[in-house]
Curated annotation (Swiss-Prot):
Coiled coil: none annotated. Disulfide bonds: none annotated. One of its GO terms (cellular component) is mitochondrion. This is Lipoyl synthase, mitochondrial. Belongs to the radical SAM superfamily. Lipoyl synthase family. Gene3D superfamilies: Aldolase class I. It comes from Yarrowia lipolytica (strain CLIB 122 / E 150) (Yeast).
Length: 351
């Protein structure tokens, strides 16, 4: 009798989970060319796509500035892509628009602009077979970055499950070439999970980079609803753990979006698990629905709540935490802090 009840309860739970996924967007919904009537919605500059009034703390000015224009033109000329533009980041004016180019930060997206996965929060294009890698991309990227005179650059990629190594060699080669041409530039990589292959994680971690980042995105309980089914919470945790195993003094970093309906207990548990694998830096930002095909925003989290999580993370021993409605994984204020930490470390090694 008890066995039958447990089986029945398990079946109901599985059915509810399947129903929830079926009601949400599927992988096919994100495939390139299948957008249909789902027009893009700017996550900050337009009204909320969920029918909710956008809180005042999420409104920002239209990005502008000569430096922003110059960096955009440089990218076009070299055929490079940035996640800043692909993901319509609200901080692009802050990161690109300053008068001092050496203070500017840019997040370059490698291996094309089309991902093999279809996460339910992400606006990047999706296709099962994005096409071959550009063999000239590592060199072109290194040349462009060294010419710009940027002090800190973030390299990220779309997921490339179609490649045997997930693109890890291509990624690592880009880092090495940048360091050869401009060793003073600090390089942060924001990688995918390489399908959990720890050898591929090690390839990237040992490339000479300064910061290894991989985003958890959300709490464990919501991961199957928010991310592509090939991405799991524990798999992502193992990626961050392996980066530290490969290079113990490497700074590791992750990012979490709030507003999916997570509970405080779930966020607390996530922070504890991250500290358990030695993650140094965590960022919190508000999830914004990029198009009507994507998950709805469950909650607009208040600035006060973001402040709470910033303090909680620091109390738990994280080296740094950037937390705010408009904070994104590659956030300029966080990069300035990391840059100072790395410079102090390098100076200490030189003594």
């Amino acid at each position: 009798m008890l066995k039958r009840q447990l089986h029945s309860a398990s079946k109901r739970s599985a059915t509810r989970f399947s129903d929830a996924l079926n009601k949400g967007p599927s992988f096919d919904d994100f495939l390139t060319g299948r957008a249909g009537k789902a027009a893009a919605v700017d996550p900050v500059l337009a009204a909320s796509s969920d029918g909710k009034r956008l809180p005042k703390w999420l409104k920002t000015e239209i990005p502008k500035g000569k430096n922003l224009h110059n960096i955009r033109e440089d990218l076009r000329g070299l055929g490079l892509h940035t996640v800043c533009e692909e993901a319509r980041c609200p901080n692009i004016g802050e990161c690109w628009g300053g008068s001092d180019k050496s203070k500017a930060t840019a997040t370059i997206m490698l291996m094309g602009d089309t991902c093999t996965r279809g996460c339910r929060f992400c606006s990047v294009k999706t296709n099962r077979n994005p096409g071959p890698l550009d063999p000239n991309e590592p060199e072109n990227t290194a040349v462009a970055i060294s010419k710009w005179g940027l002090g800190y650059v973030v390299l990220t990629t779309v997921d490339r499950d179609d490649l045997s190594d997930g693109g890890s060699w291509h990624f690592a080669d880009t880092v090495k070439r940048i360091k050869e041409k401009a060793p003073h530039i600090l390089v942060e990589t924001l990688s995918g999970d390489f399908r959990g292959n720890l050898d591929h994680v090690t390839t990237l971690a040992e490339s000479g980079l300064d910061v290894f980042a991989h985003n958890m995105e959300t709490v464990e309980a919501l991961t199957p609803f928010v991310r592509d089914r090939r991405a799991t919470f524990q798999q992502s945790l193992s990626v961050l753990r392996q980066a530290k195993v490969a290079v113990p003094d490497l700074i590791t970093k992750t990012s979490i979006m709030l507003g999916f309906g997570e509970t405080d207990e779930q966020v607390e548990d996530t922070l504890m698990q991250l500290r358990g694998v030695g993650v140094d830096i965590v960022t919190f930002g508000q999830y914004m629905r990029p198009t009507i095909r994507h998950l709805k925003v469950a909650e607009y989290v208040t600035p006060e709540k973001f402040d709470y999580w910033q303090k909680r993370a620091m109390d738990m021993g994280f080296l740094y935490c950037a937390s705010g409605p408009l904070v994104r994984s590659s956030y300029k204020a966080g990069e300035v802090f990391i840059e100072n930490v790395l410079k102090k470390r390098n100076a200490a090694k030189a003594v």
